[in-house]
């Protein structure tokens, strides 16, 4: 059992941060206090103001204790908000570390300064003029960066009207996502360790990994746990995405993570599930996901495919040519029909939300004709009138999809 952290009620009414076992259920914490209520919706989106559940701060504390963090270490949270991670200083073994906090949310920093007087605080943009001296950190001091940096895709269609794509960021760390830019900033600061929360998609989606490659190529993943974004206050209950609490250790240049290694990596969730990307086949490896120039007869159109969470929000077969229309090769129609059925019938765990659509390739012939019949019945505006669904099709398809998810 981890050591009990102190209760801090100054400025946050009735917030209890209790010690928890590494596998214990969540406790009442900062998310129940609505502590970002001073921010508008746009402010919460742009600042990434979704604060960290206490049990993950506890987990990071355990990792740092095991590393032997001491007075020669600087523990910095450069997007600290109200300072949830500075409860680390109440751990006896970590009390001697030097603590630095920073956030551009001046209201949050003002309150954090009252709650954690032993921490040196700044209100600077951590993504501009990135260097240790900006925060008074010596070049030779061992640095561990902790926290829950903002992760908002400034190009996303979701909340598009409230996101600010013009936040100042150094050119050499600029990406389409502030969280990715934050990781690149930590690499630029040459942090010895990085213990932060970020979307699992940074690791598992190849485009995201490549955008953040300068960080990952210099760090190895030494500990982690995955949980649902639904644990954050103010987030959607409809489509939780996987968040990883990760401990990275700086290694020799070019000796860090590769995406091929990530695909083989065995990930663990807070609920005790384990999975790897290479543990699944993906139907999207057999079909076109994005618009292309090929044309077929008959013309069948499908909406652009991304991950499973995006599939839940988007259409599948469409009757009109739009910029997001994918022309379907008739020979591969069963695969597209399977995606349509997967959207309709799959009940996937949150940790699969950023996956491509999985299937079992060697067993697909069992349902090939069934998914075509089912998709035709449910998309008659595209395929024409179908009198009845094929008997038993839905049950067989559901059973197959359940088998895929348990695979």
Question: What positions do the PLM features span?
Answer:
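Internal, well-ordered alpha/beta segment that forms a basic, Gly-enriched binding/recognition surface
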Residues: 144-156, 185-186, 194-195
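Class I S-adenosyl-L-methionine
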Residues: 1-115, 125, 130, 371, ...
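Conserved Class I SAM-dependent methyltransferase catalytic core
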Residues: 173-232, 246
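Flexible, glycine-/basic-rich loop-and-beta segments that form/coincide
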Residues: 239-297
């Amino acid at each position: 059992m981890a050591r009990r952290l102190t209760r801090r009620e100054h400025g946050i009414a009735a917030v209890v941060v209790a010690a928890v076992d590494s596998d214990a259920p969540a406790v009442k914490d900062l998310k129940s206090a609505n502590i970002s209520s001073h921010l508008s919706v746009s402010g919460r989106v742009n600042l990434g103001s979704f604060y960290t559940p206490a049990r993950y701060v506890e987990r990071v504390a355990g990792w740092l204790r095991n590393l032997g963090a001491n007075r020669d270490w600087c523990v910095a949270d450069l997007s600290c908000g109200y300072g949830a991670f500075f409860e680390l200083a109440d751990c006896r073994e970590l009390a001697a570390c030097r603590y630095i906090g920073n956030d551009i949310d001046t209201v949050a920093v003002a309150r954090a300064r009252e709650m954690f007087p032993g921490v040196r605080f700044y209100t600077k943009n951590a993504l501009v003029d990135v260097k240790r001296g900006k925060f008074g950190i010596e070049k030779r001091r061992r640095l561990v960066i902790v926290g829950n940096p903002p992760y908002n895709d400034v190009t996303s269609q979701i909340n598009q009207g409230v996101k600010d794509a013009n936040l100042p960021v150094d050119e050499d760390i600029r990406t389409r996502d502030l969280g990715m830019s934050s990781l690149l900033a930590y690499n630029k600061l040459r942090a010895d360790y990085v213990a932060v929360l970020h979307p699992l998609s940074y690791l598992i989606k190849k485009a995201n990994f490549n955008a953040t490659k300068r960080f990952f190529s210099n760090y190895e993943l030494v500990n982690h746990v995955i949980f649902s974004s639904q644990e954050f206050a103010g987030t959607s209950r409809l489509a939780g995405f996987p968040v990883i609490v990760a401990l990275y250790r700086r290694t020799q240049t070019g000796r860090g993570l590769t995406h091929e290694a990530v695909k083989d990596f065995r990930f663990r969730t807070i609920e005790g599930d384990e999975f790897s990307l290479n543990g699944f086949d993906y139907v999207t490896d057999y079909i076109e996901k994005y618009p292309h120039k090929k044309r077929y007869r008959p013309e069948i159109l499908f909406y652009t495919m991304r991950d499973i969470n995006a599939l839940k929000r988007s259409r599948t077969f469409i009757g009109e040519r739009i910029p997001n229309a994918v022309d379907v090769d008739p020979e591969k129609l069963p695969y597209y029909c399977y995606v349509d059925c997967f959207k309709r019938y799959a009940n996937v765990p949150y940790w699969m939300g950023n996956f491509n659509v999985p299937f079992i390739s060697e067993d697909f012939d069992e349902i090939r004709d069934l998914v075509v019949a089912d998709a035709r019945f449910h998309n008659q505006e595209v395929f024409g009138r179908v009198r009845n669904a094929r008997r038993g099709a839905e049950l067989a398809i559901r059973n197959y999809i359940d088998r895929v998810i348990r695979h």
